[in-house]
Amino acid sequence: MKKINIFLCAVMALFTSCSDVDLESVNFSEAVTNLIADYQDGKRDVTLSWTNPTMEGQSGIQIIQDDKDITNIDEVINSYYIQKAPTNTDVSYTVKARYSDGRVSEGQTVRLYINYEAKKGGNMVAMLVADDYTASDDEKDAVAWFKANYVDKGKGTLITPSTINDLDIEKHAACWVMCDRIGVAHGWANLPGGLASNGTVNALKAFCADGGNLLLTNHATQLTAAVGRIAEAYAPGIFGNGEGGQNNDVWGVQPIIGNAEGQIYDHSRHDIYRGMNFTSGLYERSIYTFEGAGVKGDHNCMWDLNAYGLAPEPNVVKAWEDMTNSTVLGTWNHVVDYCCAGIVDFAPTTDFPGRILAVGLASYEWNIGGENQYKDQLEMFTGNCISYLK
């Protein structure tokens, strides 16, 4: 067991006025001492321990990973367990004392590097939903389908942010993250029910770093930026969160991208569409259908490829794909040009070993307030996506 001890020397300065009256340092905040990190090569868990200040007024602890990920704990503790720390990279943890009047002490920092070889080999799939997923009819219906087809058959695990440590590369090949919520604000940091917490995001990062794959649907496509697969500047910009309304049109996905000669990208035979009905007569081109008449939320969370300043030649789809090492597999059912990316397959890279399949089309909807005549197509598509990532 490796132990890293850090001892800080406090330097006290005494200031006196002309009248020899001591000036009390009323803002002094005693720091923690004796910070230790216990860990072992080949394992991901780390235990931090320290000695708390002796002065009165301490109300909690602040732990900072790599000078950016902050965890505030509203109780006085002297140890903290990290089940899945970053591996094969330099990482730092800083511990600070928090006080009831709002003061935060200077921190002690420990730095470590864990050598770890992922034992990838699982073939199960996990589904991650918000702790409060029952607040969404769409999320509830998706979970019910996943339970019946994967959990109950021993092929899957349902997890939430409160059980995120159950996500395990030795057990799971892929993880489906689903969030479809009325009223949620734009931006991944606003995802509900713990999906945007440091613990959740770090667990997804670690899973992908070990070669695990993600299926991100609906509002969860924003996690492409959270986990670092794309820059924040390229996060999904087409966004909807309203209550929606009755709509009798058939909605789905257009897998043929573009209309310029020599620049038409036909993905209609891709594995994610295997076995589905390619339906003609509804729009200019045939589409794969997801939903019929019903109450549609219109919750897009996808990419406007004209909004990022991409090179227009030969087209913005090609520019996006080259920049992000991805493939645009689908757009809105009525679109025949290059404007938008509704389904994007982000291929593994040297820096990001996991594959991410992002489905941000509003038509990918699990509850439309009644019977969906194309529910079998939606379910087949979802199963295909999961199989593609396994």
Where are these regions (language model features)?
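Pro/Thr/Ser/Gly-rich low-complexity, intrinsically disordered linker/stalk tracts
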Residues: 19-57, 87, 102-119
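Extracellular ligand-binding/catalytic regions of CAZymes and related secreted enzymes
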Residues: 20-27, 117-118, 239, 246, ...
